[in-house]
Amino acid sequence: MPKMKTKSSAKKRFKITASGKVKVAAAGKRHGMIKRSNKFIRDARGTMVLSEQDAKKVIQHYLPNGL
């Protein structure tokens, strides 16, 4: 059976750290930022780490060979 391919869309959205955690950009900042608080805008600027359960699903289904 051939190797499972990595999803191209997932390659652009997720990064796997050396310790195996999955980093992703914060969501909800495409439009409508005028009504958001400054704290929300500041916090959404960076990246966040997925929970272990979500990271396991992402790696298993979308990034089987890593990046």
Curated annotation (Swiss-Prot):
UniProt cross-references to Gene3D superfamilies, sorted A to Z: 4.10.410.60
GO biological process: translation
Annotated GO CC locations: cytosolic large ribosomal subunit
Alphabetized UniProt keyword annotations: Ribonucleoprotein, Ribosomal protein
PROSITE patterns documented for this protein: RIBOSOMAL_L35 (PS00936)
InterPro entries: Ribosomal_bL35, Ribosomal_bL35-like, Ribosomal_bL35_CS, Ribosomal_bL35_sf
Coiled-coil portions: none
SUPFAM superfamilies hit by this protein: L35p-like
One GO MF term attached to the UniProt entry: structural constituent of ribosome
A Pfam match: Ribosomal_L35p
Transmembrane parts of this sequence: none
HAMAP family reported for this sequence: Ribosomal_bL35
Family: Belongs to the bacterial ribosomal protein bL35 family.
Designated name of the protein: Large ribosomal subunit protein bL35
Organismal lineage: Bacteria, Pseudomonadati, Pseudomonadota, Alphaproteobacteria, Hyphomicrobiales
